C-alpha cells in the first residue's frame, strides 16, 4: 500500500511513543563518566550527547518521549529540566523522566529490556500504536519517520535500525545482523568476535544502531515474557531480539543515507578515542556531521555567555585560532589554538598553544602551556608551564590517562593529586599562574 508521505508520516509520528535509554555508565570513558552518565557528556562545543537523540525525535515529529535514567543522573536531569521542558503538554507533547526504582518495582534497572518493563504502566497510559526504543548515547542525525514508515509497510513486528560498518570495527563492539533479500533479519549476534560480513561486501557488516520500532501490543507481550524468564539477562540484544527473530517478523532498516542524501554519520562515543575523534570531526571544512544545518537543528540548553574573545596581536603573543571551533565565553589571550574544539567559558593565557585537543567547559589554562592530542575535562585549572601530550611516559607518570591511540585525558582530580605529590613545584606554578583575564 502506498500512502501520501507527509500525511502518513505525520499520523505515524503522532501514534508513536519514544523511549530513550539514558542510564549507561560509559565505563570505557574512564574518568570522564566518573560523576555523570554517558548521555550527559558535553559534546560539540555546546551540546550534551543526549541532545542528538532528542532532537531527532522532535525534528521527526515525535513529541511523546520518555527517558529512562539511572547511573549518576543528577547532571542529566538538570540539563533535561533546563533544556527540554519546552514541549506543550496541552498538545499531548512531553519529555517524561523515568528514574529507576520509582516505577512498578523498587529495584534498579537490570538491563535495557527491564528498563522498559519497569515502565510498562507508563507505556500503557500513553496508548501508542508504536514504540520507538532509542539509545541516548549516540551521535547522529536521523529522520525516524522513514524508519516508522518502512516498519508499517513491511508488516514487521519489530524493525531494527542498522548501519554498515567495517567488519573489524564491529568485532566485540556492536550487535551484528544478517538479512535476506526482503530485509528480514535472519540472525543477530551481540558483539561477536568474528562478525558476519554483508554478502555484497565482505569488508562491511550490518551493525545494530540500538534503535528499535515495536508494535506496542507485541512489545508488551515480549516484555512480560522476558521479565518472567529465569535465564534472561533482560537485555534487548542478548534476549529480546534473538527470540523475536526465531519466532516473528523482524526487519532491518538500513541507515544508508543521512538527511538530504549525505553519507550517514553515526558514532558510539563509548571510548576516549571515539569521544575525541567525534568532536574533532566537527572542525573539518566539510564535517560528516553538519551541526550548522538550520533545517535539522540540534536543540539544547546553554547558559548565556558573551561572545568568544581573542586579544593581543604581537609577533610572539597573538590570540588566534585556525581550523578550530571556539565557543561562547572563551577568552584566548595571546595564545594559539589549532585544530581544536573549545567548549564554553575556556580561558587560555599568553604564550600557550593547543593543538588537536578537546577542551571541555570552564577550563583555565595558564601561561606557556602546550597541549597536544588531549581531552581536558571540565573545570580543570592547568598550571603555567605544563606540557601535555608530547611524552606519554611522562603523562602517565603524572597520573594522566593515555588512551590506546595516544589521547591524553586530564581531570582536575589528576591535577590536584599531582600538586600534592610535588607541592614545591606546584607552589611555584600557582605563584606564576595568571591573575588577570587578559594575561
Curated annotation (Swiss-Prot):
The keyword DNA damage does not apply. Pfam families: Hexapep_GlmU (PF24894), NTP_transferase (PF00483). One of its GO terms (biological process) is glycogen biosynthetic process. Transmembrane segments: none annotated. Alpha-D-glucose 1-phosphate binds at residues 109, 175, 190-191, 208. PROSITE patterns: ADP_GLC_PYROPHOSPH_1, ADP_GLC_PYROPHOSPH_2, ADP_GLC_PYROPHOSPH_3. Its EC number is 2.7.7.27. It is an enzyme of class 2 (transferase). One of its GO terms (molecular function) is ATP binding. The keyword DNA repair does not apply. Keywords: ATP-binding, Carbohydrate metabolism, Glycogen biosynthesis, Glycogen metabolism, Nucleotide-binding, Nucleotidyltransferase, Transferase. It comes from the Bacteria. InterPro entries: ADP-Glc_PPase, ADP_Glu_pyroP_CS, GlgC_bac, GlmU/GlgC-like_hexapep, NTP_transferase_dom, Nucleotide-diphossugar_trans, Trimer_LpxA-like_sf. It catalyses: alpha-D-glucose 1-phosphate + ATP + H(+) = ADP-alpha-D-glucose + diphosphate. Pathway: Glycan biosynthesis; glycogen biosynthesis. Involved in the biosynthesis of ADP-glucose, a building block required for the elongation reactions to produce glycogen. Catalyzes the reaction between ATP and alpha-D-glucose 1-phosphate (G1P) to produce pyrophosphate and ADP-Glc. Belongs to the bacterial/plant glucose-1-phosphate adenylyltransferase family. NCBIfam families: glgC, PRK00725.1, PRK00844.1. Homotetramer. This is Glucose-1-phosphate adenylyltransferase 1. It comes from Pseudoalteromonas atlantica (strain T6c / ATCC BAA-1087). The gene is glgC1.
